[in-house]
């Protein structure tokens, strides 16, 4: 057995460990539980009792030699690999950290809320899934109004006991809910997301954001409405912006008007965005229709009020001179980075 130990010791000392593959092969051949060294330990039981102490000492020395050789080779290889890795230059600038910012729609909506809050308006919200009773009936829409058609409105379910369920087409239902829940005087704005079954283009989208306002009190007139809109427009677009009111029709207001501002791109000279008119529509408005007041339990003989509604996304286009509304919904980081926090 002593000869076998001496022979294995010579073999171990001459074994070259130049790579990870060599180290693993050495470990599997000599140092594992079923390796050659363990096999010699298993043969100790057949050695004469007088020779066992010396043979055991030789085997322990052999195992220690193998373990030391394996550890030294592993450390040397790790050290060589670390020297080949590129050094870290602490003088180089670190990677740039990009800080998120508020989306331009939310940024503008926040400014609009601030302007109207300074005028005494509170903020009211409501569900985006709405009943046609609030979206159409109580707002004085006749049964055959085109807005009720599936080509204009996203209906979720029809024929329910409580009425058809739809994605609200405007935030006016919030005004109805407020009038049903509160007694005049009322002064609220209703911001939120709305949905319409429209073709997607540079100027229209199937989902967009609206902000509507409602003011009901004694003696409220159209002059009060105009003063509110002029004040908002000058704070939002600048004191040099021009406005015009055009007579219009809405089922829920009478009289009604649409409000235009001078085109932000051409300065009123006429361009592709304003369709050569020099004007861009920003909102609709009017005095609250008496039928809407009655539907909400408010006496139109005692109270009067005005309402207005505008597209927040359209205002973003005006504010930042963007000519395609689709950019606001694509989440293109290249575009969003232009609006720092």
Curated annotation (Swiss-Prot):
Its EC number is 6.1.1.20. Mg(2+) binds at residue 254. Keywords: Aminoacyl-tRNA synthetase, ATP-binding, Cytoplasm, Ligase, Magnesium, Metal-binding, Nucleotide-binding, Protein biosynthesis. Coiled coil: none annotated. GO terms for molecular function: ATP binding; magnesium ion binding; phenylalanine-tRNA ligase activity; tRNA binding. The keyword Magnesium applies. It is found in: Cytoplasm. It is an enzyme of class 6 (ligase). Binds 2 magnesium ions per tetramer. Its cofactor is Mg(2+). One of its GO terms (cellular component) is cytoplasm. GO terms for biological process: phenylalanyl-tRNA aminoacylation. It catalyses: tRNA(Phe) + L-phenylalanine + ATP = L-phenylalanyl-tRNA(Phe) + AMP + diphosphate + H(+). PROSITE patterns: AA_TRNA_LIGASE_II. Pfam families: Phe_tRNA-synt_N, tRNA-synt_2d. Belongs to the class-II aminoacyl-tRNA synthetase family. Phe-tRNA synthetase alpha subunit type 1 subfamily. NCBIfam families: pheS (TIGR00468). PANTHER family: PHENYLALANINE--TRNA LIGASE, MITOCHONDRIAL, PHENYLALANYL-TRNA SYNTHETASE. Tetramer of two alpha and two beta subunits. This is Phenylalanine--tRNA ligase alpha subunit. The lineage of its organism: Bacteria, Pseudomonadati, Chlorobiota, Chlorobiia, Chlorobiales. The gene is pheS.
